[in-house]
């Protein structure tokens, strides 16, 4: 958790939970964020920061989806490798978080969606308290066993688009077995965000491991 001394108008005892959402291009990061926000807001006070290299496309899509009120979504143009802005030099995102918390000092969760990146991407502990890493079945059955920090070290690993398995020749049982082997006891979810299948497990994880952790 983070120091809240600078949040002079915050009335809640605990600092906001910072949740990093990472994964390759097209895996479903923005859709995941949309679905989670729609399910948890306004019961929980949420803000979201999206990262794109040259545009603010994810901010636009998230806003159009109605996931949150527009003023609660901020787009960041990283202008370089996506992982740099969430790991080596997270300053652009830290500034964005501070900016949003000035407007919404009682936020329960700050979501930070990274730009699409490779399996080596990971969030700086300074930026994220919990990390969600998402891949999609259409990228290939072999992805879980390729490893990488997103797969092996994320707090929750999400395999999306399970409905596409028959069309791309992917065996979900193999993907699940490989995931268990690579992650050990760390949790993962097989889901289809298009239908909402598996979303409840993601939300339960955020509540039990983040918001309501003893």
From Swiss-Prot:
NCBIfam families assigned: ureG
Record's protein name: Urease accessory protein UreG
Biological-process GO terms, alphabetical: urea catabolic process
Job description of the protein: Facilitates the functional incorporation of the urease nickel metallocenter. This process requires GTP hydrolysis, probably effectuated by UreG.
Gene: ureG
Binding site for GTP: 23-30
Family membership noted in the UniProt record: Belongs to the SIMIBI class G3E GTPase family. UreG subfamily.
GO CC annotations, alphabetized: cytoplasm
Listed GO MF terms: GTP binding; GTPase activity; nickel cation binding
Subcellular location: Cytoplasm
CDD domains given in the database record: UreG
Organism name: Bordetella pertussis (strain Tohama I / ATCC BAA-589 / NCTC 13251)
Top-level taxon of origin: Bacteria
Subunit structure: Homodimer. UreD, UreF and UreG form a complex that acts as a GTP-hydrolysis-dependent molecular chaperone, activating the urease apoprotein by helping to assemble the nickel containing metallocenter of UreC. The UreE protein probably delivers the nickel.
Keywords: Chaperone, Cytoplasm, GTP-binding, Nickel insertion, Nucleotide-binding
């Amino acid at each position: 958790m983070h120091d809240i001394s600078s949040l002079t108008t915050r009335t809640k005892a605990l600092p906001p939970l910072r949740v990093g959402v990472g994964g390759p291009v097209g895996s479903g990061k923005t859709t995941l964020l949309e679905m989670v926000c729609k399910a948890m807001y306004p019961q929980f006070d949420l803000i979201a920061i999206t990262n794109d290299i040259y545009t603010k496309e994810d901010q636009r899509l998230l806003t159009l989806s109605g996931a949150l009120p527009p003023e609660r979504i901020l787009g960041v143009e990283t202008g370089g490798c996506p992982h740099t802005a969430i790991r080596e030099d997270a300053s652009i995102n830290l500034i964005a978080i501070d900016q949003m918390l000035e407007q919404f000092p009682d936020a329960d969760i700050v979501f930070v969606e990274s730009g699409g990146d490779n399996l080596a991407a990971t969030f700086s502990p300074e930026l994220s308290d919990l990390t969600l890493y998402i891949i999609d079945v259409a990228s290939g059955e072999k992805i879980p066993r390729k490893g990488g920090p997103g797969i092996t070290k994320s707090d929750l690993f999400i395999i999306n688009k399970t409905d596409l398995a028959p069309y791309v020749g992917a065996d979900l049982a193999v993907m699940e077995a490989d995931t268990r082997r690579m992650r050990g006891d760390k949790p993962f979810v097989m889901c289809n965000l298009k239908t909402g299948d598996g979303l409840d497990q993601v939300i339960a994880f955020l509540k039990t491991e983040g918001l309501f952790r003893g």
